Each structure stands twice: as C-alpha cells, then as structure tokens.
Amino acid sequence: MFSKGMEIAGFDDELWAAIQEEERRQEDHIELIASENYASPRVLQAQGTVLTNKYAEGYPGKRYYGGCEYVDIVETLAIERAKRLFGADYANVQPHSGSQANAAVYMALLKPGDTVLGMSLAHGGHLTHGAKVNFSGKIYNAVQYGLNPETGEIDYDQVDELAREHRPKMIVAGFSAYSQVVDWQRFRAIADSVGAWLMVDMAHVAGLIAAGLYPSPVQIADVTTTTTHKTLRGPRGGLILAKANPEVEKQLNSLVFPGIQGGPLMHVIAAKAVALKEALQPDFRHYQSAVMENADAMAKTFIERGYRIVSGGTRNHLFLVDLIQKGLTGKLAEEVLGRAHITVNKNAVPNDPQSPFVTSGIRVGTPAVTTRGFGVEECRLLAGWMCDIMDCPGDETVIGQVREEVTHLCRRFPVYAN
C-alpha cells in the first residue's frame, strides 16, 4: 500500500530540484509568451487527484470499463459547463491537446487529399492550419491565405478568391499570432459560397470569448476548437464545440474515441471542469478586460518608442513586434530579454527574411502578467524596459538594470501568494 505522506523530495532529488527551479523561474521571471498562463491552485489540485488512476474509454453512460460512475459525473460537469460558457449545443472535453482536437475535426469532416484553406503560419496561423510540416499539410491539400500587406489584417478578398479557385472542403479560421478581431461571419459567407465546412480554432481567444469581450464563432462555425489553457487559464488540453448537428456530433465523438485516442485523462478533465467553473464567475470578465487593456498599453508603448507592430496595434491579448527595420532578429531579442528575466518567443512576421529558427519578430501576450496582477502602469513600464534592452541589445549594464527592476516587480506581484 501507499502512504499519503510519500513525497518526491528525498526519493528523486534530481527531479524534485528541476521542479523547484521551474517554480522559482515562474515566480522570478515575467512571462509574456501569449500561449502561457498560470493555472489556479484549484486546477492544479484537480490534476493531482486519484482520477489519474481510472481508465474510462468511451463517454458518460457508455463506457467500456466498469467503475466509471464517479468519473461520469466529472466528465458530465465539464461538458455541461463548456456548453454553458460558450453557448454550444455540443462539447467534447476529451482531446488531450488543441492539435488533437483539430486532428479529430479534420478526420471527422474530410478525407485524405481533400483541400483545406487555412491561415499561413508565416502570417499568424497555426501548424495545424495546413503547414507543410504538420499532418494538416501532409495528409490534406493545404492552401494558405494571409494578411493584407497594407493593413496587416486578414485579407478576406484573398480568402474569397482562393476559395473560389480551389473549392476547399473545409476553411479554417483562427490564429496563433494575430492581434485583430476576426470577422467570423465573413468566413461563414465565403465557406457557404463554395459549400465548405467552416472550422474555427479559437484557442488563443477562448477566454476573451467566454467573457463576452471578443465575438464568438461557436454558433457561426460548423465546429469550433480550443485549448483549455492560454486565456482560458485551465490545464493543458483540448476542447471541441459545435452547434446542433447530430451527424457531425456522432462523427466527432467517434473520431476522438476510438479514432485518435484511447482512454481520456480523467484528472485533466476534472481540471477542465474546475477552470470552466472559474470562467463562469463574474470576476473572470474583469480579468479578461484587464488582459486586453494591458496588451493595448504595451503595444502603444512599443509604437511610441519607434517599434512597428504588425497590423498597427492589438484588439485582443497579444501583438507581434516587427524587428526588421531595427536590424534585430527575433532569436536575439528573445535571448537578451531572457537574460533580463523577461520571457517572450521569437516569431515570424509577414515577409520575414529570416528562417523560422531565427525570425524577425517577437510575440508578446499579457494573460500571464495579468494573472499576477499587473495593471496598465506595470505593463507600460515593462514595455519600456523591453525597448531599452532591444535599443542596445549588447549592453549588459542595461540588461542588469532591467533585471533588477523585474526582480522588484515580481516580488510585488507573486504568482502564488503564500
């Protein structure tokens, strides 16, 4: 038998040290990667429960194993909360990730070789939207749309032209690095004009949508997918939503299980249920509003300091800083900011002359710093410090000064207060 007093510390000190160091890094560094956030202690608690022991292949009420009466309650809570939060008629909470949720949709609605029209990775799309290195670009005939070079916004005329030329079976809307509001209805009209399915990947803005601060695609698209972390602030995982269509719902369920997954991760589904309940609370809207205000304040500070923001600003939680005119690579910017304990990710920008491993931009997002309690004042300061470093990336004195400021700010705003 096991004692409940068993701990990793003292048994696997090497592993425990790495975990402790990562916890310190999260407390002592400022996190600006747009896809990262901090899960609440309640979400972390759910992931550490005995639910991890239970196999539950199938769906609530239709399992292939016995002893599922309690995990059925857990999964049903998650499903009903997801439907309520997003105004969906259908929800599948079993996908282990956003990419697996997307894969299930592809396999449910398409056949290998079918044409898919999605956003180019270089213009802000995601790997699963048709990138050649991904299953979506290998198994399917992927055609890519991008941004209007003059406005920096999605080129809907190009989407329309490509749809009429290639007659895709499915159009994918959504992004991983786009700072404006997507016109879901325009995508719907284009999809209808060529008889295509419309899938929306709202992973990055799910929290904003849940709070009613960003247009919802859920009753516009045929199927909507998301992750449950990022702005939703839950565990790492995926979620599929849809408007009422019994045939599509049946296909989606069978493609998640047994199509691409076996047993669901019940401890993660429990954590999803917790996060969804947190997102249903009134203060969640205040949090998401602050996320957007902070992103806007940072973007405007960069612009004031002479940096170019792709699409001219932000109307969500993130933005891309184009460093081409500064003669700076995204890789170097990520490195020097990291030395000051500011974490960002290098990111390709439209017409990027650098490779994806180097890039000419950085992506900046405010979900994590807002969870810590940063407001507009702190975010303006932070953006200014970042500009100080990128203005003279080889100046260790500046990096050291900013690192001190970061240390003081992190101590004022701990992630997990004692």
From Swiss-Prot:
GO biological process: glycine biosynthetic process from serine; tetrahydrofolate interconversion
Highest taxon of the lineage: Bacteria
Entry EC number(s): 2.1.2.1
EC top class, as a word: transferase
Record's GO cellular component terms: cytosol
Compartment annotation: Cytoplasm
Residues given in the record as (6S)-5,6,7,8-tetrahydrofolate binding sites: 121, 125-127, 355-357
Cofactor(s) of this protein: pyridoxal 5'-phosphate
PROSITE patterns registered for this protein in UniProt: SHMT
Reactions this protein catalyses: (6R)-5,10-methylene-5,6,7,8-tetrahydrofolate + glycine + H2O = (6S)-5,6,7,8-tetrahydrofolate + L-serine
N6-(pyridoxal phosphate)lysine found at: 230
Pfam families the UniProt entry points to: SHMT
InterPro entries per UniProt: PyrdxlP-dep_Trfase, PyrdxlP-dep_Trfase_major, PyrdxlP-dep_Trfase_small, Ser_HO-MeTrfase, Ser_HO-MeTrfase-like, Ser_HO-MeTrfase_PLP_BS, SHMT-like_dom
Primary localization: cytoplasm
GO terms of molecular function: glycine hydroxymethyltransferase activity; pyridoxal phosphate binding
Assigned keywords, A-Z: Amino-acid biosynthesis, Cytoplasm, One-carbon metabolism, Pyridoxal phosphate, Transferase
Pathway the protein acts in: One-carbon metabolism; tetrahydrofolate interconversion; Amino-acid biosynthesis; glycine biosynthesis; glycine from L-serine: step 1/1
Function: Catalyzes the reversible interconversion of serine and glycine with tetrahydrofolate (THF) serving as the one-carbon carrier. This reaction serves as the major source of one-carbon groups required for the biosynthesis of purines, thymidylate, methionine, and other important biomolecules. Also exhibits THF-independent aldolase activity toward beta-hydroxyamino acids, producing glycine and aldehydes, via a retro-aldol mechanism.
Quaternary organization: Homodimer.
Classification via HAMAP family: SHMT
Similarity comment text for this entry: Belongs to the SHMT family.
Protein name per the record: Serine hydroxymethyltransferase
Organism: Methylococcus capsulatus (strain ATCC 33009 / NCIMB 11132 / Bath)
